[in-house]
């Protein structure tokens, strides 16, 4: 099986790809990672009989023949419960800006965090959702972390723990927090998402997903669809795993967060 990648970063690139699809029909199937299909795009794929498999696509999608995704709901529930068990009750979630005309897997991650925090509100949890300001061109991770840190430190009461949408952003955030004379994890705990190779090098606590296994499962689903074989479980979720390293710790109950 030969795989040809196409990189799409915004709605205009997505529209361009789908407008050219009927003319460049040199594929037997398509795997879409991390974002939601629009109804018109789904209809176009059906019209040209192109099997479509999603990897880490929003759960409410419904526009894929099959899918395999990390269980964001379970992951965020684990994250909130972990931080609560360490004594944290004021927790933030930090993410990049997502244009209104795109729906990414990380959009669902943000909502899953909010749902998990609300479910634990009776246990004293309060939370903040911090998102970068709107921007047309992608921000560097350093600039993104700088903006998110400014928002974090501008809150009426600084959170003692932060969940971050990806490891790359989390690592940049840790660096920026330390530039602002905050110790991680003594003053503020930081939890990433992915467990990318860089997370281990940075000693970052995170939530692990298995991208290679996600790809293998997606590939098997593609082959089954091409052979017209029935899929016993067309849509599957991968269980996340907490990985504890050196950016999360128990809060000092005697210390009040800086205002």
Q: Which sequence ranges carry the predicted segments?
A:
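Glycine-rich nucleotide phosphate-binding loop and flanking beta-alpha elements
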Residues: 37-39, 169-170
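Bacterial carbohydrate/catabolite-sensing allosteric modules
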Residues: 1-4, 29, 46-54, 58-259
């Amino acid at each position: 099986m030969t795989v040809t990648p196409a990189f799409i970063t915004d709605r205009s690139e997505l529209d361009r790809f789908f407008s050219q699809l009927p003319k460049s029909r040199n594929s037997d199937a398509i795997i879409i990672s991390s974002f939601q299909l629009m109804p018109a795009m789904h209809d176009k794929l059906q019209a040209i009989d192109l099997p479509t498999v999603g990897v880490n696509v929003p759960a409410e999608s419904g526009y894929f023949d099959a899918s395999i995704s990390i269980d964001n709901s379970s992951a965020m529930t684990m994250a909130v419960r972990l931080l609560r068990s360490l004594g944290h009750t004021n927790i933030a979630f930090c993410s990049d800006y997502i244009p209104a005309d795109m729906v990414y897997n990380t959009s669902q991650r943000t909502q899953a965090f909010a749902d998990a925090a609300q479910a634990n509100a009776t246990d004293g949890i309060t939370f903040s959702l911090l998102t970068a300001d709107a921007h047309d061109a992608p921000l560097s991770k350093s600039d993104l972390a700088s903006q998110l840190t400014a928002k974090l430190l501008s809150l009426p009461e600084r959170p003692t723990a932060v969940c971050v949408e990806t490891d790359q952003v989390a690592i940049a955030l840790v660096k920026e927090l330390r530039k602002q004379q905050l110790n991680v994890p003594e003053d503020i705990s930081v939890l990433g998402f992915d467990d990318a190779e860089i997370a281990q090098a940075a000693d970052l606590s995170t939530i692990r997903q298995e991208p290679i296994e996600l790809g293998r499962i997606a590939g098997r689903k593609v082959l089954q669809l091409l052979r017209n074989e029935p899929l016993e479980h067309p849509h599957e979720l991968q269980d996340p795993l907490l990985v504890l390293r050196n950016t999360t710790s128990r809060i000092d109950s005697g210390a009040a967060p800086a205002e």
